[in-house]
């Protein structure tokens, strides 16, 4: 009871009481869903009875237990509201099926109860967040966000006026303007790429050069330097030139001035390595000659970064303090991949890129400046790709090279038509001289050798440089950096051996040709970044034009819920982009730039772009567009979809469907692979300890047979008990299982003692990550590592077995069939009259034009004299096809008999209106919590309730302050790092450009920065702040988050009155519609 002497809740206390009540209610509802029969108490549209029972399914409209549509169970008011208001009303779902209770009861409810009965592992069992746990956390954030903004307290407007918590990132967004926005120059990019470290989990890794080396020995002589300046003599041609792809000798003869060396063997020391890089070509060759690609890797550990900010007066190659320089072959990369699979059998590591034989040629034109210095600009030309023949190349009148960099540099010059023609004639002359040159030989694994020839200079002093293995360089660099992103893999012994074993080469002693190769490859990296900056410049121009329009759009959207519908009418009335209003035209231009940038990033700009492009290109060639178009033109899409669904999901004679068989087969194959890894680990463990067989048997029995044991067995202990004890003792789960098994006399104590000793060694090794190789004294640590990995494999094997059983049982297939039908039914009704055959032809034309353009870029089919600009060409390509795409959207909307387009607008407007209730809603749309705690029918200690609310409030305020410090530190460090890293600069630029058009501020929608921070705190989703350098702040923050605040009276208020009050409030909101 509350008396007159009891002070009322102030606006801040009322707001946080509302938050805590909502959070407690949501946690309660999600926790209740862990019950196998939870949906029987959920309410509409589920059944309170056994859904598999033969009796007729109850009609919820007349059920006093469940209520009908628009009514919620007091046990699940929040989740019921989300289901009825946001999920059931989603436009792409068939209305008929959604209102059909049989779908929810006989399909969804039956599957839910079956799934919960199987007993899949939890996140704690895996020592990592399971997919279900991650989805649950994100779902909790979204729902809590909705209701915190959608349910208003009586004094909440006063609270929002008082709460001025703003994060630095939000302030930075407000300061974003054209004056603050700066594009880096070519010189800055080159400096950032070559001099500044980019650490990923403590490693800065870059492959800076690729060079060839003969595996056979050749004679070394003092005359190598002289022979390098003369024309090489080669043996007679051994076999005919077959194709551009298989034989590219003429290209290498013309352009390979970067690394024209053949070396016999890999020396142990860096001095001998680089001193033996011959500048000449052997006078004789044979078919048995073999060459390898050697990748020069530049590596740095983060511990050595302290002295790396000194004066940068030296050249790029002299700036090497703290770096390791090692060489590796593709075989070394294969061994690394194999070692990682052996060291982490339960981890899915990135796939090693396939070999490719592509050669990148680039043109650099040197111009003498007035001060006598020289400057070169890069032109990337890839000349050996796909199916281009030497013969067709020699007959082509347009064979030339592609210019890929922009004209940012004032001193940069472009080859004239005459110079280009001179280059072309010399290239064709080299083709005719091919009879005197031997073809390339490749390893049996497919690795190609590259010959090295003298540098060619045209009349204008333009140099053509061939960069062997450039595509492999970027792909393998991406592979290494992806490996380093995994914290455990980055500190593994396999990675450390790969990076640090062998001699540390002295970069000062490198051959000048290798030095040129390093510079040229850096210029290609700069060129890719420059093209991205060109996209950013275009996006910035469009964003500035669109900025004012978006402000008006945002204001109109908040004031008039029909404003979006009026914009949608333009799509219905017009067939071309040029006929749209200025706002939509600007928006389309902005979208085109992002699409163009995405295309460049996917196919040309990233390290792994080439592999993705070859896959897309191959798929495009195999796609039967004409046949598909004819089918879409003359055949009913509904019948096709129905036939496909019946084909995959039909169960002839009561057997398994094709879909069930497919997934069961895949899971069976996975289980076979899993069993091989398990047996290998069991063998290793058995070799390391005589009692290890008892350990593996105990763990396996606990994972696979614990659920089948007698519940009254005194020796039985559950996974929940193990997890609780593991968390309280801060020890790994498998160790707790073995300790409890030993306590129950299931295994000998000495076996557990040996594992505990191994665990202690493992912890010490984990803390000391500087040891490169594991010595014999550290074998006990490896013993525990294998046991821990074996536990994870057992858990995953158990889950895969359950997943296979789930696919074999009919419940999942029946639900999937109903869901697919529910989704495709409204879509095919639209596409039936949307001229899909025309849309498919237009898509084929777009893809063909795109493939042709990218082919020309890669193959170097576009001349340098044409002032070709890849950035502008991609944008023009998108512009060329924009009307075809817009016409398709127009046709779909015009024939939208299901109202999907307008349904999306209504659905989005409903969400926006709901989010604004707490900040902008009227008195009738609010809950008065002061009246709520004054009710006579509750047993609440209001003074204690206020104390608990203030304790929660103090915890949140303290957490906000530390969170803000951590975030400000992160932003400050991020800004500092972004200014040092080229990729960081580009990412920051995109963020600033985006904020001009679509500000990240959510205050207008009822969401403040403080509320969003509290949301992270409520759900424990603060991974964003992990791994910062400020350890003390992190410790304070985590300690505060782990501080347990007594909320007994708050939860009592929730259970006694708030759940019912929330139910009534939400039902009243629906009744108003």
UniProtKB/Swiss-Prot annotation:
<feature type="compositionally biased region" description="Basic and acidic residues">
    <location>
        <begin position="218"/>
        <end position="228"/>
    </location>
</feature>
<keyword id="KW-0551">Lipid droplet</keyword>
<dbReference type="GO" id="GO:0005811">
    <property type="term" value="C:lipid droplet"/>
</dbReference>
<keyword id="KW-0597">Phosphoprotein</keyword>
<dbReference type="Pfam" id="PF12828">
    <property type="entry name" value="PXB"/>
</dbReference>
<dbReference type="InterPro" id="IPR024555">
    <property type="entry name" value="PX-associated"/>
</dbReference>
<dbReference type="GO" id="GO:0005789">
    <property type="term" value="C:endoplasmic reticulum membrane"/>
</dbReference>
<feature type="region of interest" description="Disordered">
    <location>
        <begin position="218"/>
        <end position="240"/>
    </location>
</feature>
<comment type="function">
    <text>Phosphoinositide-binding protein that plays a role in regulation of ergosterol distribution in the cell. Facilitates ergosterol transport between plasma membrane and lipid droplets.</text>
</comment>
<dbReference type="GO" id="GO:0035091">
    <property type="term" value="F:phosphatidylinositol binding"/>
</dbReference>
<feature type="domain" description="PX">
    <location>
        <begin position="273"/>
        <end position="506"/>
    </location>
</feature>
<keyword id="KW-0472">Membrane</keyword>
<dbReference type="GO" id="GO:0005739">
    <property type="term" value="C:mitochondrion"/>
</dbReference>
<dbReference type="InterPro" id="IPR047168">
    <property type="entry name" value="LEC1-like"/>
</dbReference>
<feature type="compositionally biased region" description="Acidic residues">
    <location>
        <begin position="432"/>
        <end position="453"/>
    </location>
</feature>
<feature type="compositionally biased region" description="Low complexity">
    <location>
        <begin position="229"/>
        <end position="238"/>
    </location>
</feature>
<keyword id="KW-0256">Endoplasmic reticulum</keyword>
<dbReference type="Pfam" id="PF12825">
    <property type="entry name" value="DUF3818"/>
</dbReference>
<dbReference type="InterPro" id="IPR036871">
    <property type="entry name" value="PX_dom_sf"/>
</dbReference>
<feature type="modified residue" description="Phosphoserine">
    <location>
        <position position="451"/>
    </location>
</feature>
<feature type="modified residue" description="Phosphoserine">
    <location>
        <position position="310"/>
    </location>
</feature>
<dbReference type="InterPro" id="IPR024554">
    <property type="entry name" value="LEC1-like_C"/>
</dbReference>
<protein>
    <recommendedName>
        <fullName>PX domain-containing protein LEC1</fullName>
    </recommendedName>
</protein>
<dbReference type="InterPro" id="IPR001683">
    <property type="entry name" value="PX_dom"/>
</dbReference>
<dbReference type="Pfam" id="PF00787">
    <property type="entry name" value="PX"/>
</dbReference>
<feature type="region of interest" description="Disordered">
    <location>
        <begin position="431"/>
        <end position="456"/>
    </location>
</feature>
């Amino acid at each position: 009871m509350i008396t007159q002497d009891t002070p009322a809740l102030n606006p801040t206390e009322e707001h946080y009481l509302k938050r805590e009540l909502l959070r407690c209610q949501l946690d309660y509802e999600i926790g209740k869903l862990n019950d196998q029969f939870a949906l029987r108490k959920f309410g509409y549209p589920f059944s309170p009875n056994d859904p598999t029972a033969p009796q007729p399914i109850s009609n919820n409209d007349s059920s006093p237990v469940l209520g009908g549509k628009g009514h919620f169970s007091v046990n699940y008011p929040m989740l019921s509201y989300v289901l009825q208001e946001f999920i059931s009303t989603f436009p792409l779902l068939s209305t008929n099926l959604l209102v059909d209770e049989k779908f929810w009861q006989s399909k969804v409810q039956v599957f839910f109860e079956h799934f919960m009965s199987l007993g899949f592992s939890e996140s704690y069992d895996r020592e990592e967040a399971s997919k279900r746990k991650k989805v649950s956390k994100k779902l909790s954030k979204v729902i809590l966000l909705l209701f915190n903004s959608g349910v208003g307290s009586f004094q909440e407007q006063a609270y929002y006026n008082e709460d001025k918590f703003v994060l630095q990132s939000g302030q930075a967004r407000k300061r974003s303007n054209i004056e603050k926005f700066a594009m880096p120059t070519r010189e800055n990019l080159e400096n950032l790429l070559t001099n500044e470290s980019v650490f990923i989990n403590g490693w800065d890794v870059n492959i800076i050069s690729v060079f060839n080396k003969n595996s056979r020995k050749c004679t070394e002589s003092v005359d190598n330097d002289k022979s390098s300046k003369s024309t090489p003599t080669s043996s007679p041609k051994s076999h005919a030139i077959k194709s551009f792809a298989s034989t590219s000798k003429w290209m290498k003869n013309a352009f390979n001035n970067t690394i024209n060396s053949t070396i016999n063997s890999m020396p142990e020391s860096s001095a001998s390595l680089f001193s033996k890089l011959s500048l000449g070509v052997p006078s004789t060759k044979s078919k048995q000659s073999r060459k390898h690609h050697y990748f020069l890797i530049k590596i740095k550990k983060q511990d050595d970064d302290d002295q790396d900010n000194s004066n940068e007066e030296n050249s790029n190659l002299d700036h090497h303090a703290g770096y390791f320089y090692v060489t590796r072959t593709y075989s070394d990369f294969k061994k690394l991949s194999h070692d990682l699979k052996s060291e982490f059998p339960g981890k899915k590591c990135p796939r090693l890129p396939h070999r490719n034989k592509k050669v990148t040629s680039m043109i650099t034109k040197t111009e003498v400046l007035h001060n006598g210095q020289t400057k070169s600009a890069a032109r990337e030309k890839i000349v050996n790709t796909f199916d281009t023949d030497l013969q067709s190349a020699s007959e082509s009148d347009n064979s030339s090279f592609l210019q890929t960099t922009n004209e940012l540099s004032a001193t940069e010059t472009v080859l004239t038509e005459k110079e280009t023609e001179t280059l072309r004639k010399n290239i064709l002359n080299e083709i005719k001289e091919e009879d005197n040159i031997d073809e390339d030989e490749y390893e049996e694994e497919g690795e190609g050798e590259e010959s090295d020839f003298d540098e060619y200079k045209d009349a204008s002093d333009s140099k053509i440089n061939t960069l062997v293995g450039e595509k492999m360089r970027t792909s393998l660099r991406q592979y290494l950096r992806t490996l380093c992103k995994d914290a455990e893999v980055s500190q593994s012994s396999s990675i450390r051996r790969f990076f640090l074993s062998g001699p540390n080469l002295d970069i000062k002693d490198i051959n000048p040709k290798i030095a040129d190769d390093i510079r040229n490859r850096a210029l290609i990296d700069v060129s890719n970044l420059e093209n991205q900056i060109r996209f950013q410049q275009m996006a910035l121009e469009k964003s500035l034009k669109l900025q004012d329009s978006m402000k008006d759009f945002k204001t109109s959207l908040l004031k008039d819920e029909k404003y979006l519908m009026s914009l949608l009418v333009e799509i219905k009335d017009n067939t071309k982009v040029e006929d749209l209003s200025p706002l939509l035209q600007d928006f389309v231009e902005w979208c085109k730039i992002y699409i163009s940038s995405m295309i460049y990033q996917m196919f040309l700009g990233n390290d792994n772009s080439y592999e993705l492009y070859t896959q897309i290109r191959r798929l495009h060639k195999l796609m039967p567009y004409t046949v598909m178009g004819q089918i879409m033109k003359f055949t009913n899409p509904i019948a096709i979809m129905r036939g496909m669904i019946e084909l995959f999901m039909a169960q002839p004679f009561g057997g398994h469907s094709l879909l069930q068989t497919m997934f069961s087969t895949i899971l069976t194959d996975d289980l076979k692979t899993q069993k091989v890894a398990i047996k290998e680990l069991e063998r290793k463990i058995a070799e390391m300890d005589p009692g290890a067989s008892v350990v593996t048997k105990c763990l396996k029995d606990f994972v696979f047979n614990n659920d089948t044991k007698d519940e009254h067995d005194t020796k039985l202990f559950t996974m929940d008990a193990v997890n609780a004890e593991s968390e309280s003792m801060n020890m790994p789960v498998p160790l707790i299982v073995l300790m409890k098994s030993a306590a129950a006399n299931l295994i000998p104590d000495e076996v557990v003692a040996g594992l505990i000793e191994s665990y202690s060694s493992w912890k010490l090794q984990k803390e000391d990550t500087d040891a490169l190789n594991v010595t014999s004294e550290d074998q006990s640590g490896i013993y525990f590592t294998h046991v821990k990995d074996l536990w994870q494999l057992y858990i995953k094997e158990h889950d895969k077995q359950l997943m296979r059983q789930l696919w074999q049982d009919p419940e999942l297939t029946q639900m999937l069939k109903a869901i697919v039908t529910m989704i495709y039914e409204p879509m095919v009704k639209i596409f039936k009259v949307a001229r899909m055959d025309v849309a498919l032809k237009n898509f084929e034309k777009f893809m063909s034009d795109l493939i042709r353009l990218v082919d020309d870029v890669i193959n170097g089919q576009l001349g340098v004299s044409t002032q070709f600009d890849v950035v502008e060409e991609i944008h023009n390509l998108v512009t060329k096809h924009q009307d075809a795409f817009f016409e398709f959207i127009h046709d779909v909307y015009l024939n939208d008999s299901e109202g999907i387009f307008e349904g999306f607008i209504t659905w989005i407007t409903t969400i926006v209106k709901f989010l604004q209730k707490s900040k902008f809603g009227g008195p009738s749309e609010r809950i008065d919590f002061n009246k709520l705690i004054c009710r006579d029918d509750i047993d609440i200690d209001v003074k204690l309730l206020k104390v608990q609310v203030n304790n929660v409030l103090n915890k949140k305020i303290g957490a906000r302050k530390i969170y803000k410090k951590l975030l400000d530190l992160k932003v400050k460090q991020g800004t500092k790092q972004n200014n040092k890293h080229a990729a960081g600069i580009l990412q920051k630029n995109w963020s600033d450009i985006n904020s001009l058009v679509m500000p990240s501020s959510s205050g207008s929608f009822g969401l403040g920065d403080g509320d969003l921070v509290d949301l992270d705190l409520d759900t424990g989703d603060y991974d964003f702040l992990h791994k910062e350098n400020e350890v003390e702040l992190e410790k304070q923050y985590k300690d505060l988050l782990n501080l347990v605040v007594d909320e007994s009276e708050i939860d009592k208020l929730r259970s006694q009155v708030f759940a019912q009050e929330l139910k009534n409030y939400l039902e009243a909101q629906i009744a108003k519609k």
